[in-house]
Amino acid sequence: MLEVVISDIQAREILDSRGYPTLYVKVITNTGTFGEACVPSGASTGIKEALELRDQDTSRYQGKGVLQALKNVKEVLLPVLQGVSIFDQILIDSIMVEADGTPNKEKLGANAILGVSLAAAKAAAATLGRSFYRYVGGCFAHILPCPMMNLINGGMHANNGLQFQEFMIRPIGAHSLQEAVRMGADVFHTLKNLLNDKHLATGVGDEGGFAPQLKSNSEALDLLVLAIEKAGFQPGEEISLALDCAASSFYDTKTETYAGKNSQEQVGILADLCDRYPIDSIEDGLAEEDFDGWELLTAELGENIQIVGDDLFVTNPELIAEGISKGLANAVLIKPNQIGTLTETSEAIQLAHSQGYTTILSHRSGETEDTTIADLAVAFNTGQIKTGSLSRSERIAKYNRLMAIEEELGSEGLFKDSNPFSGE
């Protein structure tokens, strides 16, 4: 029987949803089967993320070109991967990590390595005639994730004065992924009408949520609660709220304060918001270096709500293990491009789950039409996904893919709709 191996890798520079370059990669086997992947890019990034290689040539794309990463795919990764079994994902990824030889993939670029890693896995799935989620997750892949929908954008995702980066809804009362998407869409359109009535802008931010000029984080939360009610749902019962504070973006490392507030005061602000609003998840409520603050936040709120580490962990198994040992957070945001390979992404998720931490598969603010994260959320049974609002086709593509997976799974599929920290 002919062994199926990597025979060619193609790559090209494409544009993401913000109009900046990113990589498209195609891995082709000796039997003609292939897999394709487009690499996302973040605006709000953790300092310990794997390096996204950019050209720094200011004469094109404001220095954000990825021609060097593209060159690395063709001239470095292709030669070392030709002839490698398409089904040996661990070997494929380890060869690339070794070829790079740096702790944060700065030599070849995490964007180059991830593109090849994902495209190779998709080529393997195509060779077997399987859906990508089924190839990666096997027979255990069956949980449809509850979406965390970013309806109001702030922080580094919008230029509107809001301190926090994402104000999200979670359709926890839905009984299926399709129903969850419908509920989110109803609230999204209701919110747009509310903004129009208040003569507020209805332009959207990077992730498809609205970016109105508001005076405070509380005003954004008030609008979401009102939109939920006007759409015919019960806040906290059918639809809950979630925050991504992206606190590192407003943390002063010299004074160790958050807009003038110390860590304990910042935790107090978040606790007060949880008392006043049906919030059941807070991401990056403290800065990534503020371990003492994270301990306070987890102790204060961690028994009742999800405390999510993004910049804190950057999908890195070593950092996740360190955080677990210190009792920081109780959930991990998973972004494959933060670590750079499918194998390491899998390791991060398995480690988190083994220690009772929940996981959330996440997009980036710079996305493409690639729907990989939808399949990965089901493959790894994360139970939750962040893939933006109910607008912009690069966000909607993921929801549409999830609904297709739900239909394919049929009675085998289970929609994950509860907060694991609520005691329900």
From Swiss-Prot:
Residue positions annotated to bind (2R)-2-phosphoglycerate are Q165, K335, R364, S365, K386
Q: Describe the task this protein carries out.
A: Catalyzes the reversible conversion of 2-phosphoglycerate (2-PG) into phosphoenolpyruvate (PEP). It is essential for the degradation of carbohydrates via glycolysis.
Q: What is its EC number?
A: 4.2.1.11
Task: Kindly list the cofactors needed.
Answer: Mg(2+)
Give the source's domain of life in one word.
Bacteria
- Which GO cellular component terms, listed alphabetically, does the Swiss-Prot or TrEMBL entry include? cell surface; extracellular region; phosphopyruvate hydratase complex
Natural source organism: Chlamydia abortus (strain DSM 27085 / S26/3) (Chlamydophila abortus)
**What name appears for this protein in its UniProt entry?**
Enolase
Q: Which gene encodes it?
A: eno
Swiss-Prot/TrEMBL GO biological process terms: glycolytic process
